[in-house]
Amino acid sequence: QDKLKSISANIDGGQPWRRGFGDNIVYTDWKKNNYFKAVKNEIKNNGRIGIEYDHINFENLKKLQYLLPDSEFADISKITMRQRMVKSDEEIDLIRNGSQVADIGGAACVEAIGEGVPEHEIALHSTSAMVREIAHRYPGSDIMDTWTWFQSGINTDGAHNPVSTRK
């Protein structure tokens, strides 16, 4: 492999470069299909391109095929998933720590439950406990995407439903 480069949206600023490996190209979405144009500028139009077909919709695949007509596209979904199943010691430690942090959040959730307590307050208590624990375990890190799903009533019909002010 000659180079490693990520292509990310302008809204993410420099974070993909800071948190990633290799170089990073930032594109704007001011014009339609700028992402695909950025991909075209980075990929030789005569090679073999691996794509996870289970992660790209038909329309976007067609855009890539149009922009790179001399390239061969290959489905790498299965081999990529097999590679993801192999974990390094560092990844296993992260998974263990994540499970322990989730247990702390679950205990905080149970601790906050009470008659008349809105579900959003219970979720906030749980999330705060987890964020504090993550900050303790990983000082100097960026903390993002940590939250608690704590739904009741009709919102229990789906995993990604929002918390509410229901008591």
Residue ranges and their predicted role:
Residues A9-Q15, E111, E133-P139:
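A broad, low-specificity signal for short, low-complexity segments enriched in glycine/proline
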Residues Y53, V110-E119:
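Conserved short loop/turn motifs at secondary-structure junctions
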Residues Q1-G105:
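A composition/biophysics-driven feature that prefers long, compositionally simple stretches
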Residues S99-C109, E119-T127:
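Active-site pocket-lining segments that scaffold enzyme catalytic pockets across diverse folds
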Residues L67, S77-I79, E119-K167:
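Short catalytic-site patches enriched in acidic/histidine residues
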Residues K87-E90, V117, E121:
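A structural signal for alpha-helical segments
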